[in-house]
């Protein structure tokens, strides 16, 4: 399940592109999530009223939250699998406060991959996609493990 040094390098190379416009990437990830999986929108009181893509694009709060999500994920990815200290509080809040099921983490992972494919086709070939998929799978597995410890069946 672990990634090789080369795979982590591929992940972090493309992540550098994300960080150059983290709020733009985050906004696009959340819009794809909410459009592709409208049930996920119900977990966000702050965004429930946003019905159209235009409303979502115009929302500064959505843009800010997208940046927050990807900043947290970037912090985890940079730990190259040694992310227990970062995962624990995230799992705690997502299990006990936000009640975000693991399935929704799969959905957002798919959206992240799609946004990277769309925005960075030259830097996100098959090897980089495979590495990012493995990194996001590791993240989800560790979130799920923490959820289980917390008694959350999400």
Curated annotation (Swiss-Prot):
EC number: 1.7.-.-, 1.11.1.-
UniProt-annotated binding residues for O2: 65
PROSITE patterns, alphabetized: GLOBIN
Top-level EC class: oxidoreductase
A molecular function GO annotation: peroxidase activity
Record-listed Phosphoserine modification sites: 4
Transmembrane segments: none
Gene Ontology terms describing biological process: removal of superoxide radicals
Signal peptide span: none
Principal cellular location given in the protein's record: cytoplasm
Residues annotated for heme b binding in this entry: 94
Role: Monomeric heme protein which primary function is to store oxygen and facilitate its diffusion within muscle tissues. Reversibly binds oxygen through a pentacoordinated heme iron and enables its timely and efficient release as needed during periods of heightened demand. Depending on the oxidative conditions of tissues and cells, and in addition to its ability to bind oxygen, it also has a nitrite reductase activity whereby it regulates the production of bioactive nitric oxide.
Family as reported in the entry's similarity comment: Belongs to the globin family.
Name of protein: Myoglobin
Species: Gorilla gorilla beringei (Mountain gorilla)
Name of the encoding gene: MB
């Amino acid at each position: 399940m672990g990634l090789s040094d080369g795979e982590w390098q591929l992940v972090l190379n493309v992540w550098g592109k994300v960080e150059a416009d983290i709020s733009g990437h985050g906004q696009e990830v959340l819009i794809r999530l909410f459009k592709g999986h409208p049930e996920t929108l119900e977990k966000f009181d702050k965004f429930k009223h946003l019905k159209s893509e235009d409303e979502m694009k115009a929302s500064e709060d959505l843009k800010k939250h997208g940046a927050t999500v990807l900043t947290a994920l970037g912090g985890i990815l940079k730990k190259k699998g040694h992310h227990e200290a970062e995962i624990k509080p995230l799992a705690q809040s997502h299990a006990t406060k936000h009640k975000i099921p693991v399935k929704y983490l799969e959905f957002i992972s798919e959206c992240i991959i799609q946004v990277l494919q769309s925005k960075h086709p030259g830097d996100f070939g098959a090897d980089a996609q495979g590495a990012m998929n493995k990194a996001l799978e590791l993240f989800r597995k560790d979130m799920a493990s923490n959820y289980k410890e917390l008694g959350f069946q999400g």
